């Protein structure tokens, strides 16, 4: 059984990690341990580079806390131009897989507040009345009318980031 350290305690992200690992390695093939670690970037990262750095930092910090694990996984959400997206970073001590998620364009009413220094999650909670929306369906769930959720979009990015770990051509 793979010991997987999730560099987040966010249920939406943990669900995506678990589903993706079970899709690739088989049901019941892994045990997820969530840990809260620092990203080293602002609460609301801006741009692909800063967001990716946050995910990389979380993986490195999780690995320092739990060096005995088989995998360390981080999902860092950010804002790039007028959209939200995330970077997924997965490490197994030998190689690293990284993938960027799909992007969701955000309306100006939301972006204006985020650009003024507020994090997307609290802005969306205020807008929707849903407490801790970032730990649930997220802006993705709201603006796609539930057709996608934060977790479902992250799931795809985790699957992509896992590609180097089960395809020999990457080695």
UniProtKB/Swiss-Prot annotation:
Binds 1 divalent metal cation per subunit; can use either Mg(2+) or Mn(2+). GO terms for biological process: nucleotide metabolic process; thiamine metabolic process. Its EC number is 3.6.1.73. The keyword Nucleus does not apply. This is Inosine/xanthosine triphosphatase. Its cofactor is Mg(2+); Mn(2+). It is an enzyme of class 3 (hydrolase). Keywords: Hydrolase, Magnesium, Manganese, Metal-binding, Nucleotide metabolism, Nucleotide-binding. Mg(2+) binds at residues 38, 68. GO terms for molecular function: ITPase activity; metal ion binding; nucleotide binding; ribonucleoside triphosphate phosphatase activity. Pfam families: NTPase_I-T. Phosphatase that hydrolyzes non-canonical purine nucleotides such as XTP and ITP to their respective diphosphate derivatives. Probably excludes non-canonical purines from DNA/RNA precursor pool, thus preventing their incorporation into DNA/RNA and avoiding chromosomal lesions. Belongs to the YjjX NTPase family. InterPro entries: ITPase-like_fam (IPR029001), Non_canon_purine_NTPase (IPR002786), NTPase/PRRC1 (IPR026533), YjjX_NTPase (IPR050299). Homodimer. It catalyses: XTP + H2O = XDP + phosphate + H(+); ITP + H2O = IDP + phosphate + H(+). It comes from the Bacteria. NCBIfam families: inosine/xanthosine triphosphatase, PRK05074.1. Substrate binds at residues 8-13. The gene is yjjX. It comes from Salmonella agona (strain SL483).
């Amino acid at each position: 059984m793979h010991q997987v350290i999730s560099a987040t305690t966010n249920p939406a992200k943990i669900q995506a990690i678990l589903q993706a690992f079970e899709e690739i390695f088989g049901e019941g093939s892994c045990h997820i341990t969530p840990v809260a670690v620092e990203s080293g970037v602002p609460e609301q990262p801006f741009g692909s580079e800063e967001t990716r750095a946050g995910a990389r930092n979380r993986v490195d910090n999780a690995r320092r806390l739990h060096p005995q694990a088989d995998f360390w996984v981080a999902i860092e959400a950010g804002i790039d131009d007028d959209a939200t997206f995330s970077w997924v970073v997965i490490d197994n001590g030998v190689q690293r897989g990284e993938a960027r998620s799909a992007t969701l364009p955000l309306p100006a009413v939301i972006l204006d507040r985020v650009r003024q220094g507020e994090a997307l999650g609290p802005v969306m909670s205020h807008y929707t009345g849903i407490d801790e929306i970032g730990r649930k369906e997220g802006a993705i769930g709201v603006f796609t009318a539930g057709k996608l959720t934060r977790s479902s979009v992250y799931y795809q990015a985790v699957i992509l980031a896992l590609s180097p770990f089960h395809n020999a051509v990457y080695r």
